[in-house]
Amino acid sequence: LLAFTGHKALLGPTGTGGLVVGERAVIAPWREGGTGGDSSSPVQPSEFPHRLEGGTPNVFGIAGLREGAKILLERGVESILSHEREMLAVFYRALKDPARYSWYGADHVIAGQCGEGRVGLVGINLPGFAPAEMAAILDERFDIAVRAGLHCAPYAHKHLGTFPQGTVRLSVGLLTTAEEMSEAAGAFDEVAASVPSDASSGS
């Protein structure tokens, strides 16, 4: 079994996803009701995928997911990943003093632009600011959207030593521009300028 979400890297709408079921897997619905396809039957049909898809399908969401997948196939996953890594490098190079921040992941990998093992996001904190506070400032003062907190991965943050507050997650994508990343770096630096340098030594 392989479950996936559609609204992240696949560029689909929220509320989309899927479950890939291997031929050897034997699974059955844990609760049954109206199937939408054969309302006279009290149980789900035996054929797939209808056996696992009760009710009215999310047609608009699936159509959007299909278009997202088409874009990925047309642009190429490696090409998109290369662009995302370059955008992170632009952000890193645009910061006045990257060492003032706490980085999670290999910041030298970003600076070197090789990006080996990194996807289009980075966890970053500014000592002196809780991640949620930093995210609120970026939103309210600079109209920059980031994600703060544990990112649905509390055990990963326990491993990183960032539990329970988490990190500020900066995510980039296919449509992210170098200008946007430079503006984001300027916003981070403006917030950092309000913190005494001795209280803002990154790790």
Task: List PLM regions with ranges.
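Pyridoxal 5′-phosphate
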Residues: 1-203
